[in-house]
Design a protein with these regions (language model features):
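Glycan-recognition and catalytic cores of secretory/periplasmic carbohydrate-active enzymes
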Residues: 1-145
Length: 145
């Protein structure tokens, strides 16, 4: 049996995943998941990005499927933020980037002109996140599909 099929490799992969999920918890922001500064803290000078929020939702949904404690809360936060703050209620689709805080109506605020645009790249991650969260039976995930 080679390294890729070994128990040791599976344990190593599991430790790597758990470490990544632990670090990812610090990316939590009111409207999704944000960028990190070099010191590992949330960067308040950068927007909350659709691709990052979707990727984190995907990762935490995988954690739910693997039974890793604490992942449900983060997966649910991601699904809720994608549905509530990123969705463009006027023109459809999802904003590419939004502010850290919602507006007075509780909706996401596009981050300058860049956030108002729609990128297929980011939407692909949203589909991946929604499908994985649906598989993990997270509330509201199926509606994202």
């Amino acid at each position: 049996m080679g390294w890729l099929e070994s128990v040791e490799h599976n344990r190593w992969l599991s430790r790597q995943l758990q470490d990544l999920l632990e670090r990812g918890r610090a990316a939590w922001a009111p409207t999704g998941f944000g960028y990190f500064r070099p010191d590992g803290h949330l960067d308040l000078d950068k927007p909350i990005d659709l691709a990052i929020t979707a990727r984190m939702t995907f990762a935490f949904s995988l954690g739910v499927l693997m039974g890793i404690p604490g992942c449900r809360r983060y997966a649910d936060h991601g699904v809720r933020c994608l549905q509530t703050y990123f969705r463009d209620r006027e023109y459809g689709g999802w904003f590419t980037a939004i502010d850290h805080d919602p507006n007075e109506d509780g909706h996401g605020v596009p981050w300058s002109d860049a956030g108002d645009s729609k990128w297929q790249y980011a939407h692909a991650f949203l589909i991946l996140a929604a499908a994985t969260a649906t598989n993990a039976n997270r509330p509201g995930a199926h509606e994202l599909l």
